[in-house]
Amino acid sequence: MIDEMMKRATLFINEFHAINDFDKDVFVKEVDRTPSQMIAYQLGWINLILSWEQDNKDGKHVITPTENYKWNNLGGLYQSFYDQYAACSLETLIERFQQDVHKIIQLVESYSDQELFEPGGRQWATSTPANWPVWKWIHINTVAPFKSFRTKIRKWKKMKGQ
């Protein structure tokens, strides 16, 4: 899982090195997010997982995705991610992404196999009827979007002639 996360994270973030900071907020018709929004989305989910874990360690009951956003309002949650990172340069977003991926890898390494792979490993992972094991929450919010958003940024670059 960690190897795949590192591989997908690297492939995803390396796509941004050739993008000029002036273009970070440019929409192209064929892609639903700007380059900065693509990274902000990843940062938002990674940091939600990290905050869920910290809140559990602090004895707090976690409500997913957040107390302010429910699963039927993910558009509002995504907008909050974009707003949170809107003032950041592309270079800063890339650096934060790399740092936060390192943090999520450290988190995965800290789990026992039982905590990671069996349902009920963490309270926050049992907060929906699906009762997924922790690994699935992490995979769906890291590896999977790293892969799908790499396709998006490659399409964005192609449409921009980069």
Give the location of each predicted region.
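Solvent-exposed interaction patches of small proteins and small membrane subunits
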Residues: 1-7, 59-62, 88, 92, ...
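Short, contiguous, pocket-lining structural segments
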Residues: 1-8, 30, 96, 141, ...
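Residues that form generic nucleotide/phosphate-binding pockets
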Residues: 4, 15, 56, 84, ...
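Long, hydrophobic N-terminal alpha-helical segment
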Residues: 6-44
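Alpha-helical packing segments of well-folded alpha/beta enzyme cores
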Residues: 8-12, 45, 49, 89, ...
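Charged/polar positions within long, soluble alpha-helices
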Residues: 14-17, 21, 47, 51-54, ...
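Short, contiguous alpha-helical
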Residues: 28-76, 119-162
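Acidic/histidine-rich alpha-helical segments that form the ligand environment
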Residues: 73-117
